[in-house]
């Protein structure tokens, strides 16, 4: 088998509709757009969400919630990802050096997901109860 001998299965691809090629084709003259009107013009059509002047659904529904500014600079780290960090001490800079979080992250929390085999010391990071138990069970410790 060679790449130049490959072809799609029979019936898998249909030919593109050729419009404006005579009345016998079924899509001649108006090309399936009907007569006149906004949608028949080139570039014609209404924007997404426009409902013909009726108050759109997006505006009929009430506003709710907000976007937390702290969420933009916070990250969650899984226990299993700690294996990628070189060294025994894990802090925010160690996570950044291991490319586990981006440079703009200011807060990180370690959550229990996966396992950890080697003892590590976690400094200055928040840790969930389950993650704390797993780290201490592996012989590690948490320092605030």
From Swiss-Prot:
Role played: Binds to the 23S rRNA.
Pfam family, one: Ribosomal_L27A
Gene3D superfamilies: 3.100.10.10
GO biological process per UniProt: translation
Alphabetical UniProt keywords: Ribonucleoprotein, Ribosomal protein, RNA-binding, rRNA-binding
Segments for region (Disordered): 1-49
Assembly: Part of the 50S ribosomal subunit.
A single Gene Ontology CC term: cytosolic large ribosomal subunit
Name under which the protein is recorded: Large ribosomal subunit protein uL15
SUPFAM superfamilies per record: Ribosomal proteins L15p and L18e (SSF52080)
Residue spans crossing the bilayer: none
GO molecular function annotation: rRNA binding; structural constituent of ribosome
Bias kind Gly residues: ranges: 21-31
Family: Belongs to the universal ribosomal protein uL15 family.
């Amino acid at each position: 088998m060679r790449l130049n001998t490959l072809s799609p299965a029979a019936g898998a691809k249909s030919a593109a509709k050729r419009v404006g090629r005579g009345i016998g084709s079924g899509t001649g003259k108006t090309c399936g757009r009907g007569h006149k009107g906004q949608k028949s013009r080139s570039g014609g059509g209404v924007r997404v969400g426009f409902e013909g002047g009726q108050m759109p659904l997006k505006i009929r529904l009430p506003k709710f919630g907000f976007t937390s500014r702290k969420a933009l600079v916070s990250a969650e780290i899984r226990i299993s990802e700690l294996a990628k960090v070189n060294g025994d001490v894990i802090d925010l800079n160690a996570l950044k050096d291991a490319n586990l979080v981006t440079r703009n992250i200011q807060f990180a929390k370690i959550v229990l997901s996966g396992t950890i085999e080697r003892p590590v010391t976690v400094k200055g990071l928040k840790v969930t109860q389950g993650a704390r138990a797993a780290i201490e069970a592996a012989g590690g410790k948490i320092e605030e």
